Design a protein with these regions (language model features):
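Basic nucleic-acid-binding interfaces
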Residues: 1-86
Length: 86
């Protein structure tokens, strides 16, 4: 599962050919959440509230890039890294 970004101890990953809806995996320590790209909703798992707020700030800034990477991953094309949250 390629890592597409890392910031404040949070790792963002995408799986190739993963199931809909479009989402990414946010890992913080021992916690992991599946976060919908379009809405920021956590579909499965859990990460602390502060980490989730940072993830959603980053998600909103990079929404189009996330959509494009999701499409690439579904087609098994190379996934591009995304700039971390400053």
């Amino acid at each position: 599962m390629p890592e597409i970004s890392r910031f404040y101890g949070i790792v963002i990953r995408l799986y190739y050919r993963d199931h809909p809806p479009a989402h990414f995996h946010a890992i913080y320590g021992e916690h992991e959440a599946l976060v919908e790209i379009e809405t920021g909703t956590v579909n499965r798992g859990w990460i602390p509230k502060t980490a989730l707020e940072l993830v959603n700030q980053w998600r909103m800034i990079h929404l189009q890039e996330l959509r494009e990477d999701w499409s690439r991953a579904r087609q098994q094309m190379p996934i591009l890294p995304i700039t971390p949250l400053d």
